[in-house]
Each structure stands twice: as structure tokens, then as C-alpha cells.
Amino acid sequence: MKNIAFLFLVLLAPIFSFGQLQSPDAYLGYTLGTKFTRHHQVVEYFRHVAASSDQVVLDPYGETYEGRLLQLAYVSSPQNIERLEELRLGHLKNTGLVEGTPNDDIAVVWLSFNVHGNESSSTEAAMKTIHSLITEHQDWLENTVVIIDPCINPDGRDRYVNWYKQNRSLPYDPNPMAREHNELWQSGRTNHYIFDLNRDWAWASQVESQQRIQKYNRWLPHVHVDFHEQGINEPYYFAPAAKPLHEIITPFQMEFQDWLAKNHARYFDKNGWFYFTKERFDLLYPSYGDTYPTYLGAIGMTYEQAGNGRAGLGIDNDEGIELTLIDRIAHHHTTALSTVETASNNKTALNTNFQKYFADSKRKYQSYILTGSAGKIAPLKRLLDLHQIRYEYLNGTQQIKGYDYQAQRNQTTRFDNGALVIPTNQVKGKMAQVLFEPDTALQDSITYDITAWSLPYAYGLKAMASNSKINTQAQSAPSAATPPLGEAMGWGTSYDSFEDGKFLAALIKANINVRYSQKPLTNSGKNWKRGNLFILKGDNLKNPDYATTARQIADKHQKALDPISTGYADQGPDMGSYALQWIKKPQIAVLAEGRVSSYNYGEIWHFFEQQLKFPFHQVRANELNSRVLDQIDVLILPAGRYTLLNAPDKKEALLQWMRKGGRLLAFGSALNAFSGQEPFGLKKKENEREIDPLLPYEDQERESMSYLTTGSIYEASVDGSHPIGMGYTKEYYSLKLSADAYEILEDGDNVAYLTKTA
């Protein structure tokens, strides 16, 4: 009898243990969709699930800029969870990153929720999805590992959720004009620095992206879904994607999207939910949550639910239908489960074609060769390291035949020993091709985003794409250490990259006086260019530790310093010449809020705080006055619509400040405030193209879009003798995001301008 009782208890134990698991509704104390859930509550629920189930393990992978936790949840059968690392390594054998016989028994599905913070239904859906998987669909988990990132952008999401809770009506007001449907200047869509994390997968400029990319490349899933929201009037979108499709995408990747779509449609049709496919959302620009995984062999997709920051708990759309948060959660939850189901049912096809993707050695070019200063090469190498793209170095000076990026034609170009070489016969070779190719083939000129991103242009490097055999070496020559100052009167160093700018900023913050040369000179056996920096003993007599501090900063920034033995130049100006100008520590202000572009402001904010690491003042646009101007040397106007020149008193205050030496920097559309205004002499260039008034209606959208410049690389000619142009090469390649252009200044300095052929 005791044995029977013991057996009864053993059989009941899993039931009692499983019974401890609560649904999101039960755990949170409200029905999902009737409230928004803050990030710390989401974290707590996922911890509850992991503590209550042997089918889930959590993997914290970092923090946001504001200190919120980023974490993954691995969901599978108990047996798979126990050997999760074994499964990961076996899966990577499909790619060649790990040697050995591949594991083709498991499908790996990665679900990424809430990259845009105010597209907030998807994190709610993530909680419902993980609960459904482990309580209703254990059969799928027998051969599938599901990786769930419940919230990629918790800073933005909490910004939205907190704002909505503070501004909603009770009960909520579904009228679109209500305050709860109109966010403030810094919306919840973006992260702390107002960056769009869905456009940061490849560039990884933000800490959230950097941490996530490391985890993603440890798994390289078969399927990746990026959950989004769109306008309140749109039906649900799921793949297949629209054209253009990058030529590297395989037929199977598109075929599997069709399989998924048919399974999604089965559920949506049953519920009477509208959807659309093959429109609007293409697969081209490589920094999205669908394209980046696609170029790494996955079935990468975007799912788009109606909603975004306008929707709140409920909103009436233009058809008079109320769109509720409950509806939005249901749709994302359905496609999430349908995705896992389809992957589980087709795990063999996924594994077979995943292996084929990485085994395919066809490439447009065999290697990319790049050369430039150490300061320009270093940030590119950091990006390649993050994405685990292998690079080598040229072994000896070589004449290489291929496509020259600067000449924009096929020719033979000399590259010196140590030039950077990225071979494409590697596991990440297809991704390397996408990021480095000089021109991207387009199936359709109408695309969702920019069509130009080639990294050699972005990093300002001389480059060639070649099919020639390249002799390479694994290591580059080590850089020389900074010599002690000894009896020398200071150091000189180059200045031709943003890395050099960071070095200069660190020196200035450490109260080390620095000069730059306005003219070329020869001193201490070395030729110095315009813009080169000089750290001299005579400028730092009141700072006895300046030499030690300067060397420490140079070592930290991997910056070579060359000793200046005498102030007397062999050629050009001496160290005491007026041509060597002292660099003053500037007081900088950047305008924010109002009609300022939040995106452009965020770029500038991130630039100063996270890249340059130099202080600046954030000033509200409507609070700019003479008192503010008197305290600053530099005023930065991000893109936006400004009226500061409309009021005569404000215009005069600005002009007086500029006459006293104030420097004004205007970005993008901020230039419109000065166009046609005296005494600035700035004139906007009018577009000379005309639209045919008799054009058929169906062709009008395509014709109007052909006038737009949403992302193209242009060659600019730079005056390197001007202080602003010092350190640049004569040709500079820039990404233009609009068609706005201005006439050459007749009274002023044209430091850089687009050539006539641009």
C-alpha cells in the first residue's frame, strides 16, 4: 500500500510542479490587453516562468543605456534544455563555424519583440506566447528551440507605457484626437538616444544592438521574426516580402516564407482577420531585423500589426472600427505560434537548406582590399570583429586588378603591405559581400529604405573589389609605442579620422593645451600636414604632469606621438608661428524639442556623449536667448523647422553673437531657416524636373518617388586648406538622405561641394 501511495505521489509531482506555473493574466492580476505591462513586470513574469518550468531557461545578455535588463528565454523540451549548449554547437556545424557532423534534428526559431518601443503590443504577446508554447504545444518543442527576446528596446517601451498611463482617460478614449493618441517630442519608438534600433542591426552603433548581435551570432537561427506595428488603418502584414530582394537571397528562403504565409493565412482566415503580403516591406537594406538574419542564412521576416504609438488601449480607425490592444496581442500571438509550428514541421528542409546557404561559394568578388590611416581602419575592424567577419592583411606591396571604388571603374591599383583584406571565402562571406559591394543590384527602384551603404565609402577608405588571387598574412605589423618626451619640446601627431577627434577631445578634457598647424611643415625629420596636432611643453608649463597624461591618453586611443626636438622648422612655420593655432575648449549647445528633428538630435546627442565623449549643453529651442548665447562658443541646430530668424530681436541677437566669434552649425532642413535670409547668402537650389500632368494615376506614385533621394552616396570635393576641411582627402563620399541642395556661396567659403557629375 505504501508503494502504491509513493507511486501515486511520484506521478502527481509533475502535475503539482506544473500547476505552479501561472498564465500572464493570473500572475499580473489583469487580463492582457486591458493594461500595458511595464518592463520590470515582464522581466518578473519571465523569471516566474523559468522558475516554474523545466522547459525554459533565461539568458541575461546586457543592459540598456538606462540600465534596464536585456534577456533571452530559451524554450524547448526538458531534454533539449538539458543539452542546450550541445544543440547550439551541433547547429553551428551547419554553417562551418564549428567543425564536425551537423545536427539536423532541431529547428532554431528566434522571435524578437518590441524593437520599436511604442509598437507595444508585441511584448504583451511575448508573455502570452511563451506560456502557450510550454502549456499547449510541447510537441513542437520536441524538435525546436525557440529563442524569445521579449523586449529589444525596453527604454523606449517604458517611455511610451509610462507616458500613456499618465495621459490616458478613464475609461480610455478611442477618439484619435484624444491626447492619449498623440505622443510627445521624444516618442517611445526609439531608444534612449532616439535611435531606431531596427536600422541598427548591421551598424551596431547602440549598446542594445552590440549586445544582441553577440548573442545572435552565437546561434544563427534558421528563422528570425521581427515583430512590429504600423498605422492604425493597416491590415496585418506578414511575409513573403516585397521586391526588391537582394540577389544573394536564395529561392528556398523565399519559398519558406510562402509556406509560413499559408499557415498564417489558415489561422487568420478562420478568425476573419485581414492581412496582406508581398507589398511594401522589401528585403534589401542590410540593417533591419529581417534582412540582417536573412544575409546570415535565416528566414528573416517582419510581421506588422496595426497600432503603433497612436493606438493605446483602443482607437477608432478611419473605417470606424475600434482597434484594441487585445486584438493586437491576439494577432502577434497567432503568427508567433504559427511560425514555430511551421518550423517544427519542416525542420529537415530548414537544416538542409541552411547548410546549402553556407556551403555555396559563389561570390561576386573574392576579396575586398582597403587601406587608410590607422584611425580610419580601427573602427571598421571593430565592426568586423563584432559580426565575426574574418579579415587578413596584404603580404607585401601588390598591384591588384579589380573595381576601384574611388575611380569607380575596373583598373589595376597599387596597395601597400599591411592593407586590410576581407576574403569572401569564409562563413560570413555573403554578409561581407552585402556590406562591401560597391553597387547593389536592384530589381525595383521603389524601396522601403536607402539603397547605398557600401562600407569603404562610409569609412572613407581607399578600396578595391577584386577577383584576383591575393597574397595575405594573418597579422599586421605592431604599432610603435609613444617614446618618452626626454629633452624634446613636445609631440606631433596626425589628424585625419574621427578616432583622432576622440583623442583630441580627451586631451582637451584633461586640460592639455593643443595646437594645430594651418600650413604644412617639416620638423624633426618628419613632414607634417595641415591640421596635424602638436602638444608642446611651452603651452603646458602650468601642468607639470601633462606629458605623462598625454602619453596615457595616447596609449588608450592607440595613437602614435612623434617627438618634436626643436621649435625651428626645416621647412614651413616654426612652432611659435601664428600658423600654429591654439585649440580652445569650446562651450557647445544643441537645440532640442519643439520643431527640432528628434532623430537628428539623438544622433548629435549620442555623438557627443558616447562617441566623442565631450560635454555639451542641451537647450530647449524655445529658450534660446542672449543669455544662453553669451555662455557658449558653438550653437548646433539639428534638422528641423526653425523660426528664430523671424523675430527681429532674436535674429539680431544671433548675428551679434556670430560677429563676436560664435560658430553656428545647421544640419539638414535647419538650413532652410537661413535660405534667402540676409546676410547669410544661402540660396536653395530648385529642382528643375517637371512631372507630366497627363501621367496615368497608377504611374504617379512611382514617378513622384523617383524624385526622392532617400539614401544615395555622393562624391564631394573638399578644400583641404580650409580649417574645416583639414584632414580630409580631396574627395569625400557622403550619404545624402534628401534631395535638398543649395547653390555655391558667392560670399563665403565653400569647404565642400558636390561635383557637377554627382
How should each PLM-predicted stretch be described?
Residues D149-N153, Y164, F227-E234, A670-L671:
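Short, solvent-exposed turn/loop segments enriched in Gly/Ser/Thr/Pro and often Arg
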